[in-house]
Amino acid sequence: MGGDHGPHVLLLAARNSLQKLPKLQLTICGHASAYAQFSDDLDVKTRLRVDFVDCDEVVTMTDKPTTALRKKKRSSMRKVIDLVKSGDVQACVSSGNTGALMAIAYYVLKTLPGISRPALISWLPKGQGKKVLLLDLGASVNCDAEGLFQYAVMGSVLAEQCSHIHEPKVALLNVGQEDIKGNTLVKHADQLLRDCPSVNYIGYVEGDEIFSGDADVVVTDGFTGNIALKSSEGIAKLVINEIKQATIETFFARLLSKLALPLLKKLYQRINPDQYNGASLIGLRGIVVKSHGNASAEACYYAIKQAYEEAENAVPDKIKTKIESVLMEH
């Protein structure tokens, strides 16, 4: 029950999720005091779809990953991941400390066979109302070519299973499209992907093409991916704020904004970061989704929806099968 805004926002998201996803069964881990009012507000039928596990420890945003892993074994974060491992739940969502979540998930769940390190992956908006998957977003700052290759395979599976994209187009993020561009890491990964017929690899893309190019999946190391993600979020906020400011500065602007309101709402819906909340830690033997710590209830709903869709499509099993077939090719 972590997050910057406390359990209230997460419980609102839980209620929304139960209303919008009729097959969803929820297990909520946290302090019993937070759950009491939430349970009272549910109708009898919905209440049967919710279980609660009382946890007397919390991983704070300032806890070091090692502290959370070794000393907070009764925390809500540890409990939800333990439930995934035991099979009592099919997926978990947390708004808590990212480093702690990754450390606990990696330690408890372990990686799938053939996967050296998990990766954080998330959807981002693209032109014409489409979406693109970007990974790694910071799970591993340093990565080798084999790691990038594994990310490409996992991203391809997620795009195919959760967005039903047939043969998703996969690209490597680089400083140019030409073969001579890039460092040794990217060039080696490029060759590995060119030699893999199981991945629909289309070559390099530059930073601006993440949001406008042909790729359905863009692969990079965690250091670069995290910067790209945070930059895109900052630009989205800037655009939204500038549009709001421009529409209230003068009487004419206010009048014009009313005429353009349907168009502005449509634009906002496309770039609103809330609907892209929820970064999946893929490559593990279980589903773990990280929600932004400062996410709204609506944004948290999308993180829950992401976890639900991955569970519904058995994404870890599909990644395992794909990796096994790729290893046989090599």
Residue ranges and their predicted role:
Residues 45-51, 197-199, 284-285:
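A short helix-to-beta-strand connector/capping loop
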Residues 6-9, 21, 25-27, 32, ...:
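Glycine-rich phosphate/diphosphate-binding loop of Rossmann-like nucleotide-binding domains
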Residues 4-11, 35, 74-84, 91-105, ...:
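Short glycine/serine/threonine-rich phosphate/pyrophosphate-binding segments
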Residues 13-17, 100, 104-121, 188-193, ...:
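A glycine- and small-aliphatic-rich helix-loop capping segment at beta-alpha/alpha-beta transitions
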Residues 44-89:
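Phosphate/nucleotide-donor binding subsite
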Residues 4-61:
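N-terminal glycine-rich anion-binding loop in soluble enzyme alpha/beta folds
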Residues 106-120, 126-130, 134, 214-218, ...:
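Glycine-rich phosphate/nucleotide-binding loop
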Residues 28-29, 51-53, 94-96, 123-124, ...:
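Short beta-strand segments
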